[in-house]
Amino acid sequence: MASSGVRSVGKNLMKLKFTDKGIIDYRDCLNEMLSLIKTSPEGHEIWYLEHPSVFTVGISEKEIKEDPNSDPPIYKTDRGGKITYHGIGQIVFYFMLNLKQTPFKPSELTKKILASTSVAIEDLGLKNNISESDPGLYVNGEKLASIGMRIKSNYSYHGLSLNHDVNLK
């Protein structure tokens, strides 16, 4: 189910589409993201979804090898960060943003997403802090949210994983 809107920022109008992708395989979702940004969309899209159990390995992790046959599978990806577990009960937000149409520099993207998420989480009564050394949001020393982004041809993709009701044991 998708919803869309137009938001005014200064003199700019930004088209923004939110899409609930439900439960979707990580590789299928990645292919959809890449297909979308290849079309050079004018506006922005934010997808929210869950993945069946999977580990994704970002470009900062050099030791762990891809193993699609392991349980859960391990996939190398081109996002920033190290290794992240995704599973049912974790809400993933993917941000496909046209960075030519944002009021901030591409280098500020990750910090803007984390700051906005931190405020939203705090508004729900959950005191949290942002870590610079291991980017994400922490509550009482436990990681609540991880972030890993990639920018290609002025478009962002990948995003933020928020642990809601996931078994991390």
Label every PLM stretch briefly.
Residues 1-4:
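Compositionally biased, low-complexity intrinsically disordered regions
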